[in-house]
Amino acid sequence: MPVITLPDGSTRHYEQSLSVLDVALDIHPRLAKSCIAGRFNDQLIDACDLLSVDGKLQIITPSDGEAVEIIRHSCAHLLGHAVKQLWPETKMAIGPVIENGFYYDLDIESPLTQEDLELLEKRMHELAHKNYTVIKKKVSWQKARDTFSKRGESYKIAILDENIDSSDQPNLYFHEEYIDMCRGPHVPNMSFCHYFKLQKTSGAYWRGDSKNKTLQRVYGTAWSDKKQLDAYLNRLEEATKRDHRKIGKTQDLYHFQEEAPGMVFWHENGWIVFRELEILIREKLKEYEYQEVKGPFMMDRVLWEKTGHWENYSENMFTTLSENREYCIKPMNCPGHLEIFKQGLKSYRDLPLRMAEFGSCHRNEPSGALHGLMRVRGFTQDDAHIFCTEKQVRKEVSNCIKMTYDIYQTFGFKKIAVKLSTRPEKRIGSDEIWTQAEEDLASVLKEQGITFELQPGEGAFYGPKIEFTLYDCLDRAWQCGTVQLDFSLPVRLNAFYIDENSERQVPVMIHRAILGSIERFIGILTEEYAGFFPVWLAPVQVMLINITEKQSDYVKKVAKNLQQLGVRAKVDLRNEKIGFKIRQHTLYRIPYILVCGDKEVESNQIAVRTHSGKDLGSFSVNVFADKLLEEISSRCLH
């Protein structure tokens, strides 16, 4: 006789087992109509699942946060339903939910074209608008295997054989004649799956292994209502306009080519942006009293075996042979910094020792995962490592956080999510050390008034960490900064200092990154600003243009004066119409366009326009230069 407790604290007593949907109907018919699933004793379950014991129940409706993930999962099944109707010989692999949508991997005879994708989406809409009931059946492992064997679904059989214990009872979901397998929950009927859009296809290896067959991956998005779907599609359209790969090409920032996949060819304009970021970071390094060092980009495999990287990370490392020795191109800077720390005896008086590097790192990312500047093989880390005593941890972490926020605010990022990851089951170090370390990190965050999300068990085996995630103008999340405590690496590489009692002690090592990868951060900034870099970052800060040839000498003179002041100024003396030149440089997103005609020459002035097309009027060269230099030195965002 289940007693069901509802979110408002009220209880309902029932004489027999009943489904989530039955409870919703008992409360109100309208609630039953909008019931997608249930949360019973903190576990999501299907609307058709029976409740036979006492517990707390929340009816999940489209307005609840959990609903959209259930809808997306069911849309993946809907995609499978439509695929099997259009191309019956297709074998279905996996169809999980991902951020903002879902995908399904298909073993299909011919690659899907854009026309195929449109046809598939149309069929999905036709099926969804039938509002048919989705039937769930919990069956034996053998029954599930027999079902998919009869249908020739070899990938589903592989999942059963390799991932599901033969004593388990898998869930089968019936979409009319189509059958799929899933943990669930799923929608009770297809009336909840009307707001979706198929987006693209790509290749994907079965099980993510390049030795396996390449499948067709179809991506889609799905939402609870039309308003949410339209808003997301509008954000996607805006993201396309802001795509750093497109802007990088139009602004001549960088390029990639087949001979060096995932490695950036920086052009002059892009390298200027890169160097400006380095200058900013170097200023902060000086302010926070760091040493800047430079380690080798390649070291003997023996060292990486000592650190544990070879055992856990070798497949992501590039290697090379020379004189019968195997070398690894470094994927990270930390071992090199430890080796520098070990040179010369260190005393407790030398600590904290803060060591920073713009380290050139390489990681052997899968070619299919490479994506412009956002996912590369060769990148530069604004990496630092702090060696300190346990008593110094709190102060050093506090300074790391302050430095991180200082830099993020320079770029105008206001929404920053912070996560604190604590001890995992498998770890090194005593519980006492972990407790102290976790308390130190949490206390520092609280002292600075920073709200954070606790992630129990998500820390690395060698120490807890703080992660900083930036949200851009399109509300996309970019995980950039980290502050990570490390109890392991100094022990592995025999690093020590002499304490006040003349005894050896192992230092605490703090890994600290703010931008993460400079390449990736430039990609993020390019999209955040849509290529309209603030003046201090802009590759070309000022473009001077003449109206006729008569003003050429004056334009050159003004440009030279600005260049001598450190301004990145260029001239355009082409024999083109003034409107054409203004439009072109506006498209290049140059912050200031200075127009010089006879009037400006006579008055020793310049007519100033912004990259948005706004006419600021005429200024004397000196007044404009003072204003511009103030914008640059203050790193003004506007």
Swiss-Prot record:
Location of this chain's protein in the cell: Cytoplasm
Catalytic activity: tRNA(Thr) + L-threonine + ATP = L-threonyl-tRNA(Thr) + AMP + diphosphate + H(+)
Domain TGS: 1-61
Signal peptide residue numbers: none
Region (Catalytic): 243-534
Cofactor(s), names only, from the UniProt record: Zn(2+)
Binding locations of Zn(2+): 334, 385, 511
Keywords: Aminoacyl-tRNA synthetase, ATP-binding, Cytoplasm, Ligase, Metal-binding, Nucleotide-binding, Protein biosynthesis, RNA-binding, tRNA-binding, Zinc
Function description: Catalyzes the attachment of threonine to tRNA(Thr) in a two-step reaction: L-threonine is first activated by ATP to form Thr-AMP and then transferred to the acceptor end of tRNA(Thr). Also edits incorrectly charged L-seryl-tRNA(Thr).
Subunit note: Homodimer.
Family designation: Belongs to the class-II aminoacyl-tRNA synthetase family.
Protein name: Threonine--tRNA ligase
Organism: Hamiltonella defensa subsp. Acyrthosiphon pisum (strain 5AT)
Organism lineage string: Bacteria, Pseudomonadati, Pseudomonadota, Gammaproteobacteria, Enterobacterales
Gene label: thrS
